[in-house]
Amino acid sequence: MTDLNRIRNFSIVAHIDHGKSTLADRLIQLTGTVAARDMQAQLLDQMDIERERGITIKANTVRIEYPAKDGHTYILNLIDTPGHVDFAYEVSRSMQAVEGSLLVVDASQGVEAQTLANVYQAIDADHEIVPVLNKVDLPAAEPDRVREQIEDVIGIDASEAVEISAKTGIGIPDVLEAIVTRLPAPKGDRDAPLKAMLVDSYYDSYLGVVVLIRVIDGVIKKGDKIKMMRTGGQYPVDRLGVFTPKMKDIGELGPGEMGFLTASIKQVRDTRVGDTITHDKHGAEQPLAGFKPSQPVVFCGLFPVDTNQFEDLRDAIEKLALNDASFSHEMETSAALGFGFRCGFLGLLHLEVIRDRLEREYDIDLITTAPSVIYHVHMRDETMVDLHNPADMPDPAAIDRIEEPRIKATILVPDDYLGDVLKLCQDRRGIQIDLTYAGTRAMVVYDLPLNEVVFDFYDRLKSVTKGYASFDYQMIGYREDALVKMQVLVNDEPVDALSIMVHRDRAETRGRAMVEKLKDLIPRHMFKIPIQAAIGGRVIARETLSAMRKDVTAKCYGGDASRKRKLLDKQKAGKKKMRQFGKVEIPQSAFISALKMDG
């Protein structure tokens, strides 16, 4: 049993690439938690894709024992949380599970948008925050300027910020001392009924679902029968332990402690992040506050390039869903692409990560249709339909109005590029909410429609600011707008995978750009092919792909003109018939390129 005053629970908050996972590695290394021979970079990021992209996707915990200068040994529980906006709910749960945060800021780059988003979550969770300036060994580091920036932008005292270099190990002992002296100890009652927060869970092929927990009150022992308060599931505890980062079994976990349990849970879906775990008999009365199931925000279709791989794709998606409860999927068929799945994601990074994992870990070539968001379609008969896929749009005559999701986007940008960023946001139908300056950087807050952001906003933002802008967003609700469904017809056949929802004012430009692009991408056939963009029955843009021509009169030497005429008429009749029955093959690259467009 560990004395509560000897425990410190903390998380590390940072923007991508500011050195969060490296600092975690150093803390683990310095305290000898992992033997030197087992040490590897980004130790807590267990997926290859996390290491490769340098991002953390799932929350991970590690227990570190640290003999402090005051002669006592402290137990430090670190949660390494994701830094990206798509995983904001995982971050908020992890924040609730700890009492303090280390705010890591790159001393050469300063405060970024995601630093802000995550710090505000830490402040909301009443955290004690210790600022840490990383990368002070770089020639470009300006610790004093960044200190001022932290005070101006975030509003917390940075005069005692710890200066470190996680790469070389400078200042790491000071961080450990700051954790012990400046962060608060957890509170909790050992004799109260068990209350533990479910911080995260993942699927292990040997153990089933492994659940990361933080005990708030009471004690949990191996062999106890536990109950999930939100889902109602009851399970016996098979194993109980802590991560050092390897799994180490222990007999019990008391208040303030973090660890893992396994309880023959079959699916990750049965364990909701943020749920409350208690004993099935004499359990807690009330669950912990603040739980909300994660809702997918972005939808897109995933289809195998080779239709024979459909079964492999189904198995792969089901395996991934075991480990990711926020990822939803259902089967769909498309006339153009065959069988596939309509999948829901928390955001664009989540979509890319899942797609990369399917292609890399399961070796499946995928076609991804245009990402779309959920529209609320209010019908004239007062009912409301959630529209996930533009191809399923109800009859326009029966629709009263359509509402689209809006987001509040916070963009931090050097003021040299501010004009370009404002123009980009205006082009995407944004409404400016706020504009403030901190030193040489501007912070812009915009209200933007999510469907304008979802496709290539982030890429465009990075290109107009040469990569210097950082971006973060949160959902703020739905608003009515003049939205229409635009279809693309190739050879008079609608191509369902290219249907998109657009704003009426921008439909024509978008339609024209799309048909021009398709004209370049679709290979020529023996007959001419009209490519049209249409709203309802009205064609708004058209291009014609001319036919390949075979010279049928080549073998006529001199002779009668009517002989040539006869051959040409015969060819014309053949082409007409061909056009009537011919199928136009649209190559895979054309789908992706036609949907990725500026404007």
From Swiss-Prot:
Keyword annotations of the record: Cell inner membrane, Cell membrane, GTP-binding, Hydrolase, Membrane, Nucleotide-binding, Protein biosynthesis
EC number(s) per entry: 3.6.5.n1
Gene Ontology CC terms: plasma membrane
Every tr-type G domain range: 5-187
GO molecular function: GTP binding; GTPase activity; guanosine tetraphosphate binding; ribosome binding; translation elongation factor activity
Cellular localization per UniProt: Cell inner membrane
Pfam families: EFG_C, GTP_EFTU, GTP_EFTU_D2, LepA_C
Organism of origin: Jannaschia sp. (strain CCS1)
Paired cysteines (S-S): none
Function (record text): Required for accurate and efficient protein synthesis under certain stress conditions. May act as a fidelity factor of the translation reaction, by catalyzing a one-codon backward translocation of tRNAs on improperly translocated ribosomes. Back-translocation proceeds from a post-translocation (POST) complex to a pre-translocation (PRE) complex, thus giving elongation factor G a second chance to translocate the tRNAs correctly. Binds to ribosomes in a GTP-dependent manner.
Example GO biological process: positive regulation of translation
Amino-acid positions noted as binding GTP in the UniProt annotation, renumbered to this chain: 17-22, 134-137
Source organism, top-level taxon: Bacteria
Name recorded for this polypeptide: Elongation factor 4
Enzyme class (EC, first level): hydrolase
Topology in the lipid bilayer: Peripheral membrane protein
Main localization of the protein described in the UniProt heading: membrane
Catalytic activity of the protein: GTP + H2O = GDP + phosphate + H(+)
Cross-referenced InterPro entries: EF-4 (IPR006297), EFG_III/V (IPR035647), EFG_V-like (IPR000640), EFTu-like_2 (IPR004161), G_TR_CS (IPR031157), LepA_C_sf (IPR038363), LepA_CTD (IPR013842), LepA_IV (IPR035654)
Family indicated by similarity: Belongs to the TRAFAC class translation factor GTPase superfamily. Classic translation factor GTPase family. LepA subfamily.
